[in-house]
A protein has these predicted regions:
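Flexible "cap/lid" loop of the alpha/beta hydrolase fold
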Residues: 79-80, 84-121, 162
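Conserved HGGG/HGGXW glycine-rich cap/lid loop of the alpha/beta-hydrolase fold
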Residues: 1-43, 47
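Short beta-strand/loop motif that positions the catalytic acidic residue
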Residues: 182, 188-190, 194
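Gly/Ala-rich beta-loop-alpha elbow adjacent to hydrolase catalytic centers
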Residues: 66-70, 74
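Conserved alpha/beta-hydrolase "acid-adjacent" motif
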Residues: 195-201
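Conserved alpha/beta-hydrolase catalytic His-Asp/Glu region
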Residues: 120-173, 177-178
Length: 246
């Protein structure tokens, strides 16, 4: 299994979850380019470039679990490197983060505009504000925020170019046009209290994926594998018959 983290974080975010995945012979937690210990490539920092950089670290036939921005990368891996991905687990996932014509399951553009304005002057404060948004609404918001903040810079600080490029993906990427090309089984897991990716977006994503299915965690926010680990682990192994229809 390959676990792909979200914007501003690194692969260490999965450390508490890994023991529950002992059924997998290999458990990989790569850093996205420019995050943790991974170098940041020169030139454009877009979804395709991130995917190309990460693809060599994904063994053939892997289960790929992606969270938030990492879920977008996971879906692009499944599309462009289909032989490497046998199954997707998409956590707090959406095909588009912001609202647009024909898509009202996102959040207002202004949220990411504010992050973009403050990123240059104080990226640490920007990242901490982003963490606060991630836990907002969760029943365990305070303890979850403490844990996320304790992990944030554990592998070093992310590079500015990676933060800026990743934020542009969050603001503008729209995967809806090619979701039908993803043929691998895809399990979409969402927290009902997520304020960054509304559950309606994750439900719509599951419905748009040819082999998608959907599970909702009622008390969780944007980081359910941190805030509600027991429920999240149960959801990973839940049979399709017990899950909410997409």
């Amino acid at each position: 299994v390959v676990l792909i983290h979200g914007w501003g974080m690194h692969g260490g975010i999965w450390s508490e979850l890994l023991p529950a995945l002992e059924g997998y012979e290999t458990r990989l937690t790569p850093d996205l380019p420019g995050h943790g210990g991974a170098p940041c490539p020169d030139g454009r920092y877009g979804l395709d470039e991130i995917t190309a950089a990460l693809a060599p670290e994904v063994p053939a036939g892997a289960t790929v679990l992606g969270w938030s921005l990492g879920a977008m990368v996971a879906m692009n891996l499944a599309r462009r490197h289909a032989r490497r991905v046998s199954r997707l687990i998409l956590v707090s996932a959406t095909p588009r983060f912001t609202n647009s014509d024909g898509w009202d399951c996102g959040i207002a553009d202004g949220v990411f505009d504010l992050f973009a304005r403050t990123l240059v002057s104080d990226y640490r404060q920007t990242l901490n504000r982003f963490l606060s948004l991630q836990v907002r609404g969760s029943a365990t918001s305070r303890s979850t925020l403490r844990l996320l903040r304790s992990v944030l810079f554990a592998r070093g600080e992310p590079q500015q170019a990676a933060l800026a490029g990743g934020l542009e993906i969050l603001r503008h990427a729209d995967l809806r046009a090619w979701l039908g090309e993803i043929r691998q089984p895809a399990h979409v897991i969402a927290g009902l209290r997520d304020r960054l990716v509304p559950p309606a977006a994750s439900r719509a994503l599951a419905a748009a994926l040819p082999a998608g299915r959907f599970t909702e965690l009622p008390e969780a926010g944007h980081a359910p594998f941190v805030s509600h680990r027991t429920e999240f682990i149960s959801a990973l192994s839940a049979p399709a018959a017990t899950e909410a229809p997409a």
